[in-house]
Amino acid sequence: MEKYNREEFEEVIVDIGRVTKVVKGGRRFRFTALVVVGNRNGLVGFGYGKAKEVPDAMRKAIDDAFKNIIHVKLKGSTIPHDVEVKYNASRILLRPASEGTGVIAGGGARPIIELAGIKDILTKSLGSNNSANVVRATIKALSLLKS
């Protein structure tokens, strides 16, 4: 496992969830955080954290993200070829785009693509739009790229 300089990376919170457990004395809340980290130069990762407080969940998610960093192969400002990946009920289609197109992506895919340093890409999220599964599908798709 490589060590990364955390100052070089940006963090984006994709999702914060709250779960409630009803107990005799009232309600107990717990929080989950889904975070994406990237250096806008080919390195990107995601992490998932759970805790009783939001800041703790975010810290755990960021630590987890640095354990799951992948290197994305770029061809100029886009990706080398089309790729389609299924993760659970989510499917994501990534297509290279000509220069000047910009990032056409939504939901959980956009922060990953931007933090990976991709500037021109077309994406389509098919099936479930559950942000955790879309993030995982996007990371899986980017890891399958071959230069």
UniProtKB/Swiss-Prot annotation:
Q: Which domain of life, per UniProt? A: Bacteria
Sorted keywords for this record are: Ribonucleoprotein, Ribosomal protein, RNA-binding, rRNA-binding
Q: Name one GO molecular function term.
A: rRNA binding
Which is one Pfam family of this protein?
Answer: Ribosomal_S5
Question: Where does the S5 DRBM domain lie?
Answer: 9-72
Keyword RNA-binding found: yes
Enumerate the InterPro entries for this protein.
Ribosomal_Su5_D2-typ_SF, Ribosomal_uS5, Ribosomal_uS5_bac-type, Ribosomal_uS5_C, Ribosomal_uS5_N, Ribosomal_uS5_N_CS, Ribsml_uS5_D2-typ_fold_subgr
GO CC terms for this protein? Answer: small ribosomal subunit
Biological processes annotated in GO: translation
Query: What this chain does, per the record?
Result: With S4 and S12 plays an important role in translational accuracy. Located at the back of the 30S subunit body where it stabilizes the conformation of the head with respect to the body.
Subunit (UniProt): Part of the 30S ribosomal subunit. Contacts proteins S4 and S8.
The Swiss-Prot or TrEMBL note on domains reads: The N-terminal domain interacts with the head of the 30S subunit; the C-terminal domain interacts with the body and contacts protein S4. The interaction surface between S4 and S5 is involved in control of translational fidelity.
**Of which family is this protein a member?**
Belongs to the universal ribosomal protein uS5 family.
- Name of this chain's protein: Small ribosomal subunit protein uS5
Q: Which gene encodes it?
A: rpsE
